[in-house]
Structure formats: C-alpha cells, structure tokens
Amino acid sequence: MSSGLKTQTTIDILHDHSVESSSDHLYILKQQQQHQHEDTDSPKKKKLRHQCEETSQYIVPSLNDEVDDLGHHHLHHHHVNNINNSLLKQGLSALSSLSASSTSSISPSSSQSSSPLKQSERSIATSIDSMNDSTSSSSSSNNNNNFSSVPSHNIYTPSCLLSNLNNDTDSIIPNMNGSTDGDGGDIRREKVDENDEEVLCNDNHLSKDNEQEDNMVSFLNESNEEVIQTNNNNNNDNNNSSNICINNFCNINNNQQQQQQQQQQQQNNVNSSIILEDSNKENKTESNNSNSNSNSSPSFFHNLQQHPTSAATTTTTTTTTITTTSATTSIIIKEDNSDDEIDDECDDESEEEEEDEEEFNPFLFIKQLANATTMPPPVALPPKEHSSPKISLVLDLDETLVHCSTEPLEQPHLTFPVFFNNTEYQVFAKKRPFFEEFLHKVSDIFEVIIFTASQEVYANKLLNMIDPNNKIKYRLYRDSCVYVDGNYLKDLSVLGRDLKQVVIIDNSPQSFGFQVDNGIPIESWFEDENDKELLQLVPFLESLTNVEDVRPHIRDKFKLYQLISQA
C-alpha cells in the first residue's frame, strides 16, 4: 500500500454545446499515465484492469446509442443542459468524498500490469473521439431535415458511464476536484477549440463503500429517466410545431381559395345583373309595343301617358335605326336620389305606369332643371324671312293637336301605315276639336312651327295628311330635342329666333322647362269631342302679335313660376 503505482488521468470533455455554433467547443479525451512505483498487489490490480476493460466495452456502444437518440432532440437544449450540469456536479461532488477512501483500498501493483491499463484507457479515448465525430455528423443531418428550422444541439450525459456501478463496486469515477491530484501529480489538458471551457475529471481510486455508491447510482438513474422524458417532450413539441406550420399553410390555401370563389361569385352577380337589366329593358320595350290602348302608343309616338323611364327605354332602340340631320343632346340632372336600381319582381306594368304618372310632378322636374348643365343645341332652322310674321308660334303634335294609337279608335279621322323597325304598324288618328279653325287663324298671324318629340317617320307622314295646304312653316322632330332624365325637352334656342318673340304651346309643361316664360300649357286631349281648348287660346294669342316681348304677358297670364316654387 505504501509503494504502488500512482496513476493520474485527465479527461477533457465537451459538455452540452451545439455543433453549428461557432462559439461551442469540442474536447477530446487525453490520458497520460505516469508510473513511479511498481504495484506489488497483483490480485487487486488485476481486478482493476478487468473492470477497466469491461467499462470500455460498455461505455462505447452505450454512448453511441445515446448520441444517436439525442441527435434527434434539438429543441429546449438549454433546459436539458441545465439538468445534465446539475446531475454531473451532484454526482461528482458525491464521488469526490469517496475518492479518499478508495485510495487506501487500492495497493500498488507491478509495473508490468500498467501497460494493459493504459491500453484500455486509450481504447476509451478512441471510442469517445469516434463518438464525437458521429454526434457531429448526426446533428448536421438533423439540422438539414428540420422542418421548423430550429438549430439542433448535441447533448452528452454521463448517465451511461455511471450505470454499471450497480454491479461493479470498483469502477472509474470522474472527479472534478482541481487541476492536480492529492499527491501533487501533474494533470495535462488539451483542447481543440479556441475558447476554454473545460470539464476536468480525475481518474482516482474507487471506494468500497457500497451503500453510498448504491444511493448515488439510484439518484443518477432517476435523473436519467427525467432527461429521457424531457427529450421525449421535445420530440412532441417538434411534431406539434410541424403540424401547426402545416395547418397554417393549409389555412392560407383555403383562404386564398375562398377569396377566389368570392371574386368569382361577385363577377357572376355583376353579369347576372347586366343580363337581368337587358332582359327588363327588352320586356318593357315589348310590353310598350304590344299593350297599346287609347292611352298608349308605340315607340315612334311621344305620348304623355308613357312613364319617362319607359320612354327612355323605348327610344334607345329607335334612335339607332332612323337617320336624322341633327344630333340629340343629352344632359343629366344633378340629383341626390337615384332610381336606377333594378327591381327583382315586376308587378303589373299598367298599374305601375298609372302610379308613376300620379307621382310625376312636371313643375318639380322644372325646378330641378336649375341644377342641370347642357350644351346649347345647334340651330336647326334657317334664318327668318323678312316677309314672315314677327312672332313664331311653336306647336306640339301628340295630345296637343291630335291623338294617335295603333289600337283601333272609335270613328278615327285618319288611318295610315307606319313602317318602323322592320315592322309595319297601322295608325289610327283623331284630330282635336277645332283643329282646322285654329290652324287657319294662327297661320295668318304667326310663323307656325311644329316641334314634336315623336319620330320623323311617323310625324312627317301624319303632318302631310293633316296639313295638306302647308300652313305649317317648319317641322322639328325628336332628334332636335334634349333628353333629360327620361324626358324630351324642347330648347327653343334651336330655332335660331329671338326668344322675346317666341311662343310655345305644349301639353307637357316640362317640355319647355328651359324657357318657362315662353310656354303656354294646354290640357292633354284624347277623345273628348266637347273640348274647346284650342279655340279658347286664339284671343290671347292674337293679343301677343303687337308686343315686343311676349314673356311678361305669358308669365302674368299662367303664373307657372308660382307652381314651380310650390313644387
């Protein structure tokens, strides 16, 4: 016991650092064996050598298996590192107390037996080097296959080194007491990386206190199970993270598909609205052409009983097929309310038209014309001749002088065909009572001009029949009107005459809404044989022949501005 082999071994191990990080360090096992005395106690030395060989055979495969398993657990490495450090410190602290007693139990052996021990230690170092290389390559492979791009770390635990202590009473126990042993022997350390972070282990002698060793091993085994459970939890976290990422990716794809479906649905709705609008327009046009009665007319008529919106719909088709000399001017009234929405359900159109007629207020329409902007229409008439009368009298045609219908009338005055839009219509016409007398009188004192919102193809043929003697000087048709919100307005500036000497008679007051002071309203006529409106206007018209400006007289007579202001 006094003269024996004094052995010192240093083991430098890298503990709990990532292979990827540049600041992590990898340490290798380095042993140095110095023999100062020969061991004379051969049986105990043989037992120690035998235990070293068994330990080397167990450590290498155990470490390799554990490194392979731990290569896959790369999340929460700080938590696992803290557990391993705590276990290592507690275990080595407990074993340090045993090293003193183990020294006294081991007797020196002969120098001849030191060589097998050194060979066993070199075998352990070589195995740990290979284990470090395999750990590095395994960690790199795991990093490349990591779905969530979380860096993996190599974790080295000493549990496998200490697990054999249950069966072996004497084994090699790491010690971290300092850089020198109790006898003052030198310990050489060697590191591969630049920065120093060392774990020193002193290969001292073993203790024979089986009870303390059993307690320590039991504690380390329980801690090892906790480490394994922690690594399993890390694996579960990795799987959950991968599933969350996959679910998020699927949710993004689903959201994109839903957005595309919504856009497609909106486009289909727009297309359906356009088709429905066109269908409604066609239905309204066909209804206006087929459901004609004493108060209705085809699209070449301008009938007061037609709703302005319906008139706008029917004239859209007819204006494209008839060639005219002047362009129709259209303006838009600036109103806050809009009636352009499409109704999903259509009731009886005749009832709707009657309701719209009751609701339509021509004086309110004229009041709103103050917000309208329009370009002056081009002059449609030649200059007035010097031989012509001073005052120009503008007359409306339908429901002012005559009433026409495509439905048979009782005792019509005229019947004539009209070929319109590839369709031939039979028109039945009746002249207003006292029409001939009225026309004869006014043609002698006024320049008579017909200004109608009807189509030329119809109105021109009718005028040729009711005015065979050409008492009417000029004829203007729909193409000379101004279209405003479903109504055809007659801007008197198209005449090229001085408005001080222009008078217009129309059954639709909104028709002369731009020049209210020049307009004389008259009641619409259909079939009343007792009507005398035309005859009663002659005296007032005759009173205007000698005035310089007809507008103040018309204003005082009919007081239309009061009706407009009250609308």
From Swiss-Prot:
This is CTD small phosphatase-like protein 2. Residues 337-360 have a biased composition (Acidic residues). One of its GO terms (molecular function) is phosphoprotein phosphatase activity. Pfam families: NIF. Residues 100-118, 130-150, 286-297, 309-332 have a biased composition (Low complexity). Residues 386-544 form the FCP1 homology domain. Signal peptide: none annotated. It comes from Dictyostelium discoideum (Social amoeba). Residues 31-53, 100-150, 280-361 are annotated as: Disordered. It is an enzyme of class 3 (hydrolase). Keywords: Hydrolase, Protein phosphatase.
